Structure formats: structure tokens, C-alpha cells
């Protein structure tokens, strides 16, 4: 008897004889070429099929494009297919015959994985491999409200399911919940190419139905930053999504969910700021300019909701561009009133100190007291501003520039630049001694004005409590402004000028 049950010539496998010449209805039959492993499946025919040659109406599977595709799992054995995750292969198109699983057009076509049975595949959710697209209209998507996982999503690819709808009918191949947890795709663009006139089926669970298919990503790539210069970046029309702040229709604010530390502000709401005259625009890529860096503890202060320029919000007491805001509540930080944006002298550069006071980094020829936040507007007028360390009891410790090169020529010698006295009152600085140091021509005049008592030469100075010694802090001494004075060298000099009858 010739083998009439084979629909085509099957390839031969090692040590397995395929498509024997002596074939009956109970013998092995070749599957179509869509099966990945090209193995066999036992076809149990009825008695009417008999020994008359195995008619093609019951034993020979035929494919139809319009029929429902049921995946069939096969293994490289004869007549006993068993299902496993690795061997769950491509779908096989079959008609509603006796020996093959049939698909009803009115029911939802789910992926089917075979167990170790004969000709009766059963579905197992754990071994579901490939999703199947079916043209069903009365089916509800098999989506769990709690997990919101796609129907058949592999953790390796994390790509949307490819859909091939032929006509304008609703398909359910897309995941019903567009919030995958284990996958991290890019901004969700539906791969299912449905014609414009087709309306896909709406998911039944209302809990997870963002219409724009916006996944909940730990690091979303579609959230524009406030520091971004692109003004056309509008948020996607999502109703409820943890990835984006609520959008206000009254303003054209750019929302952001950036959680940066230094170079980007922490924005939990749409930020609209008016770019001030002394604030340069931010650079979104590297943020090299230190004036656009705002500490994460500073809360953005937005004066007006328009014109919504992409500017960086800085706190009210620390707003000049030539200072780095390190702490929002600084007691001696005053804003700079610059007449024009170009009024940025060379002696006022953004500092990098971690002090609580806005402290500029000035050239050696210029010295700034941190409380004086008004630098000159031209490099030639950078005259040293001499202020005493302690003009009276002050309650806080002044963070002075500790470098000896920043010491001005008119700075008083009785206060070492390396000493940081602790003061005991709280009012503003007031100048005490602003005279220039004695020159060579004025040595006689300076010698005649040397005090003979232990009182300081400044009349309005008050005693201060220093950290080094208990001696009188305002004993005049002869100094050289250009030479550095250390803690050891400056300490013995006041003791040498003490009166003998003390």
C-alpha cells in the first residue's frame, strides 16, 4: 500500500524513519512546514477512513488563511507529541477536522500548548509561547487587573506584539493593559498597524487604561526636562500616568519628572519661570554654567505663570547669577542688582565653595566680604572693600576666604586671615577700619600714632572672642600686605608690643 497520508515530502531526521511507504490510517503523518521541528503527529482516523487509502478528508491536514491559528507543540518523537517551553513552536493552520483542534470564530482564540497527549492539545498559561491574533469580536481580553501584564509577553524581547489585521475588524492582539512591569520599552508606539477607519477593541478593566499606551517605566525616556531648550516638547495625552505631572491648559508649561541632584531642578509640578536679567539660560546637555545649577533642597520660586520661559528657579534670597546657591536660607546673601545682563565684571565669578554663604571667587587683588553681594560693574573699579571681621558681637561665625592670597592691602593686621572668630550678636556689618596700610613715606606718621595702651587703634571696635588666644586682638603690628602671615607668625607679635607695666 502506498503512503497516501503524507501531504508533502518530509525531511529525514537522524535515526528516525519518516514517511514510510507502508502507511495506514494509524501511522505517522507529516505536519505542514510551519512546525519548527518538522516532526510528526499521530492522526487517529475514524473507521470510515479505513484501509481504503486514507482519504484526505480526515487524515491530511490542510491550511486555510481565514481559519484560526492554533499553536501546536511537537517534539522529535514519533506519534507521541509532548509539550515543553522550548519546543512550543510556530502556529499551525488547520481546519475543523476530526483529528485537529478546531477554532470557533465566535470564541476568543487563545494560544494553545500541547501536553503529552495524542491529538488533544490543552492550554497551559505557564508554557504560553507565541500570541495569536484572531478576528474575534465578542471576546474579552485575558488581562488581570492586579498584574496588568500583556497576554503573552516574553521577558527577553519586551517588544509589542506584531499584528496583521487584514480587514477593518477589531483585533485583540495588543495587550489590554499598557503598563508592563517587567518590560521597559521606549515611549509606547503601537506596532499594530490598524487602518484609520478601524476601531480596536477597548480594554474592559478601567483601572489600567491609559489611552496613549504609556508604560510605567522606572526611568522614562519621554519626560522632557525643564532645562531642555526644546519648547515644542508637549506631553502625551495621557489621563492618569505616574510618569508625568498633571498638565495645565492655562499655561504652556513644560512638565518634567526629572529627579536630578545638581544640574537639574527637582520639579514635581509644571514650572513657569521668567528669565531674569542676570540669569543666563540653562544648558540642557552638560550644564557647564554653574549659575543654572540649583541645589535639590531649594524649592523653585516662580513669580508668574507666563511667559513660561525654560529658566531655572532659584530661591528669593539667593538669586544673583555669580553665586552658587548652596543653601536656601542664608542670613547674609543679598541679590545683585545688575543694571544690564552684560554687567558681569571679571572679579565676580561663580564660586565653588560649599559654604552656606554665597561666596564669590575673586582674583587676588580683590577681596569681597560675603555679606556684600554687590560687586562693581567694571573690572577696573574692583577696589578692595575693607570690612572688619568683628565690628561687634555677632551671633554667627563668618565663613571667610581662608586663602592668604585673597587678603586685601587695607586689611587690618590685628585679625589674622586664618582665624575665624566666634561672634556673639546679630546685626549687619559696619565698617570700622578702612584706612590703607602705612607706606614708606608715612612710617614716621604711623609710628607716632602707635598706641601705648592695650586698647585697639579702632575706636568703635569691641572685644571679640577668638579661637586662638585670649590676648587683645587689636594690637597694631607692622605687616607687609604681600607676605603671607601664618598662625604661628602672627601670634607672637601682639605679645611683643605689650606694655611692661601690664
Curated annotation (Swiss-Prot):
Keyword Transferase: no
Sequence repeats: from-to residues: 4-8, 58-62, 73-77, 93-97, 108-112, 113-117, 133-137, 152-156, 177-181, 187-191, 212-216, 222-226, 272-276, 292-296, 347-351
Annotated segments matching region Disordered: 435-502
Record keywords: Keratin, Repeat
Regions of compositional bias (Low complexity) in chain numbering: 489-502
UniProt signal peptide: none
InterPro entries: KAP
One cellular component term from this protein's GO annotations in UniProt: cytosol
Region (15 X 5 AA repeats of C-C-X(3)): 73-307
Repeat is among the record's keywords: yes
UniProt similarity note: Belongs to the KRTAP type 16 family.
Subunit structure: Interacts with hair keratins.
Protein task: In the hair cortex, hair keratin intermediate filaments are embedded in an interfilamentous matrix, consisting of hair keratin-associated proteins (KRTAP), which are essential for the formation of a rigid and resistant hair shaft through their extensive disulfide bond cross-linking with abundant cysteine residues of hair keratins. The matrix proteins include the high-sulfur and high-glycine-tyrosine keratins.
Protein name per its UniProtKB record: Keratin-associated protein 16-1
Source species: Mus musculus (Mouse)
Primary gene name: Krtap16-1
Amino acid at each position: 500500500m502506498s503512503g497516501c497520508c503524507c501531504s508533502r515530502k518530509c525531511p529525514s531526521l537522524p535515526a528516525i524513519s519518516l514517511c514510510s511507504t507502508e502507511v495506514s490510517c494509524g501511522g505517522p503523518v507529516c505536519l505542514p512546514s510551519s512546525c519548527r521541528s518538522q516532526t510528526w503527529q499521530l492522526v487517529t482516523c475514524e473507521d470510515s477512513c479505513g484501509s481504503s487509502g486514507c482519504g484526505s478528508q480526515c487524515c491530511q491536514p490542510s491550511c486555510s488563511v481565514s481559519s484560526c491559528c492554533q499553536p501546536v507543540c511537537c517534539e522529535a518523537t514519533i506519534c507521541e507529541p509532548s509539550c515543553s517551553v522550548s519546543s512550543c513552536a510556530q502556529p499551525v493552520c488547520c481546519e475543523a477536522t476530526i483529528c485537529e483542534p478546531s477554532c470557533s470564530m465566535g470564541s476568543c482564540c487563545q494560544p494553545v500548548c500541547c501536553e503529552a497527549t495524542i491529538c488533544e492539545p490543552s492550554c497551559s498559561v505557564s508554557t504560553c509561547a507565541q500570541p495569536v491574533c484572531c478576528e474575534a469580536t465578542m471576546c474579552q481580553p485575558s488581562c488581570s487587573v492586579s498584574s496588568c501584564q500583556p497576554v503573552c509577553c516574553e521577558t527577553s524581547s519586551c517588544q509589542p506584539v506584531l499584528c496583521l489585521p487584514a480587514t477593518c475588524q477589531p483585533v485583540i492582539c495588543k495587550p489590554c493593559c499598557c503598563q508592563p512591569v517587567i518590560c521597559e520599552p521606549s515611549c509606547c508606539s503601537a506596532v499594530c498597524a490598524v487602518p484609520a477607519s478601524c476601531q480596536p477593541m477597548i480594554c474592559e478593566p478601567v483601572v489600567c487604561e491609559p489611552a496613549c499606551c504609556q508604560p510605567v517605566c522606572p526611568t522614562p525616556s519621554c519626560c522632557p526636562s525643564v532645562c531642555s531648550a526644546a519648547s515644542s516638547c508637549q506631553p502625551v495625552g495621557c489621563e492618569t500616568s505616574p510618569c508625568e505631572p498633571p498638565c495645565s491648559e492655562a499655561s504652556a508649561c513644560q512638565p518634567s519628572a526629572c529627579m536630578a541632584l545638581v544640574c537639574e531642578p527637582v520639579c514635581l509640578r509644571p514650572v513657569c519661570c521668567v528669565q531674569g536679567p542676570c540669569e543666563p539660560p540653562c544648558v540642557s546637555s552638560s550644564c557647564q554654567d554653574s549659575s543654572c545649577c540649583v541645589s535639590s533642597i531649594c524649592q523653585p520660586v516662580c513669580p508668574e505663570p507666563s511667559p513660561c520661559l525654560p529658566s531655572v528657579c532659584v530661591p528669593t534670597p539667593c538669586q544673583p547669577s555669580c553665586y552658587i546657591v548652596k543653601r536656601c536660607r542664608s542670613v547674609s546673601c543679598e541679590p545683585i542688582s545688575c543694571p544690564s545682563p552684560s554687567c558681569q565684571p571679571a572679579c565676580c565669578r561663580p564660586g565653588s565653595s560649599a559654604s552656606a554663604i554665597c561666596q564669590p571667587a575673586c582674583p587676588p587683588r580683590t577681596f569681597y566680604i560675603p555679606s556684600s553681594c554687590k560687586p562693581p560693574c567694571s573690572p577696573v573699579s574692583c577696589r578692595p572693600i575693607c570690612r572688619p571681621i568683628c565690628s561687634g558681637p555677632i551671633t554667627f561665625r563668618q565663613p571667610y576666604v581662608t586663602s592668604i592670597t585673597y587678603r586685601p592691602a587695607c586689611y587690618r593686621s590685628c585679625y589674622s586671615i586664618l582665624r575665624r572668630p566666634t561672634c556673639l550678636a546679630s546685626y549687619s556689618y559696619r565698617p570700622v577700619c578702612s584706612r590703607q596700610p602705612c607706606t614708606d613715606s608715612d612710617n614716621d606718621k604711623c609710628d607716632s600714632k602707635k598706641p601705648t595702651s592695650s586698647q585697639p587703634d579702632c575706636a568703635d571696635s569691641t572685644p571679640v572672642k577668638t579661637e586662638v588666644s585670649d590676648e587683645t586682638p587689636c594690637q597694631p603690628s607692622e605687616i607687609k600686605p604681600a607676605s603671607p602671615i601664618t598662625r604661628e607668625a602672627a601670634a607672637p607679635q601682639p605679645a611683643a608690643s605689650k606694655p611692661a607695666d601690664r
